[in-house]
Every structure is written in structure tokens, then in C-alpha cells.
Amino acid sequence: MRPAHFLASVVTAAAAVIALANPASAAPVNYVALGDSYASGLGTGSYDGTSGSCKRGPLAYPALWAAATAPASFKSVACSGARTGDVINGQTAALSTSTTLVTLQVGGNDAGFTDVITTCTFGSDQDCVNRVNQSKTFIANTLPGLLDNTYGAVRGKAPSARVVVLGYPRIYKVPGTCNVGLSDTKRSAINSGSDALHNAISARAAAAGFGYVDVRGAFGGHEICSSDWWLNSLSWPVEESYHPNRAGHQSGYLPALRAVVG
């Protein structure tokens, strides 16, 4: 090999090594969290006073992820009680063309989660099963269209963002350690509603090209009536009932989200 060619080869190889050793700086992450009370942090007992009835707090998984990864910007507009229409008509205003990451958790309130829990708490086994079946019919027939509209609105407002949708855990360990409270028939019915939500939400997220985080496995062994609960049972304030507690966000939702997003 002639000296000039040899020198050129050395320079080229050195440049490649330098490029590998000094990768381009990662693009800044501008993160917006959307969703309902599971995303806002209701159930953790710690809330930002300025969030009012939305009950957003620093111990919710979006805030925990932001604290762990230090994105360039972070804003949560998740709100207790939010339905798909609230995301479309209100929360998506927080998105822009500069948004690079969106997490979204919604659908439980559309499906009547609160009424299901109320019916199953105060009604008979058959009342509970009937109400869950009614919810599952809604989830199968109506919720997919609502989710499609919501996901389309998110994509329209944040065309370049990575969007990750999060699901809901099963609520009860069946059979479990609880000697009082709901029957196993009721607990199993409620869990079947969680599975129906998973099926609908994961399918529509995939159809939209969004990521999906299934937290049912993460919460396995940590449901209500397990030996280590990551969800509140009937609690005070009552609105915190049947929501992830601090451990549920820190040890359940956060690792599941990081496994998908990093």
C-alpha cells in the first residue's frame, strides 16, 4: 500500500472511532402526560395545591419518570375523573409540534369504573356481575371508537411525538388473603373488566402506532387482598379507593413505563 493511501485509511478509521466514542447529543425530550386519576396520582396522598380537583401530585408515575430522567421539559395535565372527551377537548391543548414524548392513560371512566365499584360494593353478586358485563359491552362496542378519536387528536397536536399508552392493573388477588369485603365472585368480575380494558386499549393503541404498557404483570402479587398491596382498598378520602398507592406508582407503574420508554 502506498503511503498516501495508508495515511488516508488511518485517518478514516480514526474518524470512525471518534464518531463512535462521541455520539451526537440526544435530542431534548419535551414530555407531556395526559390522562385520568391513575395518571394524575390520585391515591398517593400527595397533591399539588394548584391542581385542585385534578389531584396531580409528585408521586404519580409521570412525575417520577421526569424526576428520574430529567427531560428538557415536563408537564402533566392528567386530571381525576377525565374521560376521552376531556383529553380531546382540554388536555391536548398542552401538546405542540415540539412535544417529543406523550404518555396517555384514559378509558376507565368512560367505561363506568366508579359505578362498577359502587355497585359491586353495595349490591349482590349478581348485581355486580351484571354491571361489569354492561361495562364490558361498552368497552367492546363503544370505547374503541372513543379511543381512536382520542389517539387521533393526540397525534394531530403532537405529530412528531412518541406516544405511549398505559393500561390498568387487575384490582384483586383471587383467591386472596381478605376475610371480609367483596366475595371472590365480585372480585373476579371486577378483574374481568380490567382485562376487557386491556384488550380494547392495547388494540387501539397498536392500530394508532402507539406504544402500550401492560401493568397487569407488574401488579401481579400486589393486588388488593395479596400480601403486599399496591392499590388502595376502600379508603379515606373515599376518592382514593381502588387507585394505586405510592408503591403502586413507584414500584409498579414507573418500572413498567421505563421498560418501554427508558
Summary of predicted features, one role per range:
Residues 27-78, 93:
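Serine-esterase "nucleophile elbow" of acetyl-processing enzymes
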